[in-house]
Structure formats: structure tokens, C-alpha cells
Amino acid sequence: MRSIPIQQSPNQSITVTLDGNRWSLTIKTANDTMCVDVDLNDTPILRGQRAVAGMPVIPYRRLAAGQGNFMFVTERDDNPWWERFTVDQSLHYVTA
């Protein structure tokens, strides 16, 4: 599992290369929850996925073409929330 740097910001975009793939994530607020858009090698694979602690961001392995996945880790399994990013909530990449 590899830590992915996120900011304490309500809306942000991250682009990282992991395992030879270019991942682009957009994390944004939607009312009282966080949602994630994911692109793999410039191809959109997910839009508006609700961020849930301890669960894969990409809910179906086939969407990521057998590549890795992302997971929010939070204290007490609280729902991810931007004000807690870098305090007691983080984003991680898990290799397939």
C-alpha cells in the first residue's frame, strides 16, 4: 500500500504514475460527502463515486482493467471529509 498525498482542500485534482499507469483523481465535495472521479491513462473509468472509508474507490475490478485501486483510510472508519485530510485521514494506492 502506498500513500498518495492529498491536501486539506474541498476540491482537488491529483495525477500520479503508479505501476506504469497514469492515474488522475478529482476529489470533490457533494453536500456532506466526498466524491471521486477517476481516469486511468487518460480514459475516464469512474465519475462521482462516493468516498467511503476502508472500501475500494473503484468498486469493480474490471473498471480498473485489473490494475490497482485506491482507498481512504480514516480514524474510526469515519466518512472521508476534506477538513480531516492530512490530520487523521489519508488516501492510499493498493497494487493489484
Task: Give names to the regions the model predicted.
Residues 5-7, 27, 61-63, 83-84:
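Short, exposed beta-strand/loop patches in secreted or surface proteins that constitute
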Residues 10, 22, 31, 42-44, ...:
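Residues that cap or initiate secondary-structure elements
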Residues 29-72:
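Acidic, aromatic-enriched beta-alpha/helix-loop junctions
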